[in-house]
Amino acid sequence: MFGVISSGMVAVMSQNIGAGRPGVAYQARQLGLMFNAVMGILMSVILAVFSGGILRIVSIAPALFEPAETYLKIVGGACFLNALIPIYSSYLRVFGYTKHSLIGTVVGNLINIILNSVFLFVFNWGVMGVAAATVISRVVNLLIVAGMGAVLIKAKQSPERIPSRKILAQIVKIGFPSALETALYNVAMTLIVRFMNQMDADGMNVTARSYAMQIANFSYCVGAALAQANAIMTGWRIGAKEFEECDRGTRKAVLYGLITATCFSVAFALSGHFIVHIFTDDTQMINLVVKLLIVDIFLEFGRVTNLVYGQALKTSGDAIFPVIMGAIFMYLFAVVGTYFLGIHMGLQAVGAYIAMAGDECARAVGMVLRWKSGKWKSKSLVEL
């Protein structure tokens, strides 16, 4: 639910900034802030009050119940912070203050590390100390990004305003499909992991996937960063009706992403035997992870294309198409493909990775064709 608002809010704010209407962007932030605050407080109360019941539903081991309940009451009871931080961070980023948003995250993480050490090894507070450190670090992160936004951005003083109902409708129009796509992805990944658990009795295939994902995340982070930066610039340019510049910028971001992702993934595949030794000395496991890293070259090629074009389409207002592509290909290729190649054909984790790579590449083709069609140009949220 938090993602519904924050992703839609970025599209609305960035387009209005590009259209020279920072006051409307401020309105969008206020609406997003109020909505997420209400939902965050509601979720905090639910997690704090019903933490024990929630843990019983997921059948947590009896030995872990008490510490898990303590942690969930403290961290879950403060989950409204998770609802507010993305709003203020997005507000900074869409106005171009990306480094300042990063400062809040870095300082918060450093404080978390320091307080974890103090609470665990000096005060011996155990799980309660870890939970307290997490909450305090998030409070600091929130104060930093909220304070910087108030000092650096003066959109509140801008006179432009439109009906709040219209802004909320635009936010939901973009945010709901984005959240639905994320939900579909999570369900698909759950099914894939379930199939992979059926491939062997000792969990080698699932563990190999976990190792490969940890290594490939370095490549993914580059693609995600480029997609996020390009999405903001896409919103600015669409708001200003600079469609040709928007098209060139997105193509350039995809090119940079493909070059970077390919270099990373090829390097990881070539040096896989050395890297995987960090996690395990099991020769069979190392060989399996290296095979996954080789397939991951093609997976990352498709994924970075999806990320950049998909985010650009959503920010432009064309948010339905990526959901349709995800609903079709994530299940047709990734889920069904994992079962067919991994279990039926006996390729196991390698088959699952081939299926996931096929999903990413198929969706990438669809995203490219959709972008080239130019239909996103008519989806603008701003009327000049």
Question: Model-found features: residue ranges?
Answer:
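Small-residue-rich hydrophobic transmembrane alpha-helices
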Residues: 1-45, 82-101, 193, 206-272, ...
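Short alpha-helical transmembrane segments in multi-pass integral membrane proteins
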Residues: 13-80, 122-176, 234-299, 341-384
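Transmembrane helical elements of multi-pass membrane transporters/channels
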Residues: 74, 108, 137-141, 149, ...
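A short secondary-structure junction motif
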Residues: 113, 146, 150, 190, ...
